């Protein structure tokens, strides 16, 4: 077992207005915990001050916690998350969005599940106890329609596949993310790249026979979100179809 308990992976693209507060909130929370931790910031080729802010944060917290910054070319969130997860050193790895839509305090719901033997703990904006705060109705409706299609085509057991707050045991994270087929090449993209990679992550977990727990969490809609509900929904649906086709071709079969 690793001496480091928790790795927090934070992908960030052009987040200069939100990243400093997010990182300070995460670090302040973790400093109050009895376990060892690290924060892994993956700068997704930002054009603003995001990368510099992350580097400054790492220097400021030197000696108080392990802070690492990875500078990627702009290849999209999926590639950034995969980079961070595969380089995480903790026994458990949790990734979250740079806007901290799910408060860091919600991690206390995920870690006990991982400690009790679950391989993956999935934050969910649906189910008893979940809270979706400030979300426009049309966004919620589109999300529900998308998830119904996901349940029909790929993974039928989850009420919410897209919440950006997911935790893994280290061995499980390595097994899952090494088997992903979408967005794994360092191909540069333009603009925000919101994809359906969460669906592929959960599908691979299912194919590997891993134990997955879906956990209702608190989630806040953030103004200035980079999600384009129409364009990104179409891309996500395309990704779901690609996952289904990959599955039919046996590309996720355990070896």
Protein language model features and the residues they cover:
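A conserved acidic beta->alpha catalytic loop
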Residues: 43-52, 100
């Amino acid at each position: 077992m690793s001496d480091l308990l928790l790795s927090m992976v934070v992908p960030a693209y052009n987040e200069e207005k939100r990243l400093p507060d997010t990182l300070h909130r995460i670090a302040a929370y973790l400093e109050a915990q009895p376990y060892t931790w690290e924060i892994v910031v993956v700068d997704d080729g930002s054009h603003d001050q995001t990368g510099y802010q992350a580097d400054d944060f790492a220097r400021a917290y030197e000696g108080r916690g392990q802070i690492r910054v990875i500078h990627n070319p702009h290849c999209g969130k999926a590639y950034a998350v995969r980079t961070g997860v595969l380089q995480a050193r903790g026994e458990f790895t949790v990734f979250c969005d740079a806007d901290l839509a799910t408060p860091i305090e919600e991690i206390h719901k995920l870690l006990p599940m991982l400690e009790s033997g679950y391989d993956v703990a999935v934050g969910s904006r649906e189910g008893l106890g979940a809270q979706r705060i400030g979300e426009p109705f049309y966004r919620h409706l589109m999300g529900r329609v998308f998830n119904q299609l996901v349940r029909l085509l790929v993974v039928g057991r989850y009420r919410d596949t897209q919440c950006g707050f997911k935790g893994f045991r280290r061995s499980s994270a390595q097994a899952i993310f090494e088997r992903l087929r979408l967005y794994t090449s360092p191909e540069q993209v333009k603009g925000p790249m919101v994809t359906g990679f969460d669906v592929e992550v959960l599908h691979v977990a299912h194919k590997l026979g891993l134990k997955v727990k879906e956990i209702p969490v608190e989630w806040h809609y953030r103004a200035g979100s980079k999600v384009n509900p129409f364009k990104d929904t179409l891309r996500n649906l395309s990704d779901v179809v690609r996952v289904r086709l990959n599955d039919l071709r046996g590309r996720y079969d355990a070896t």
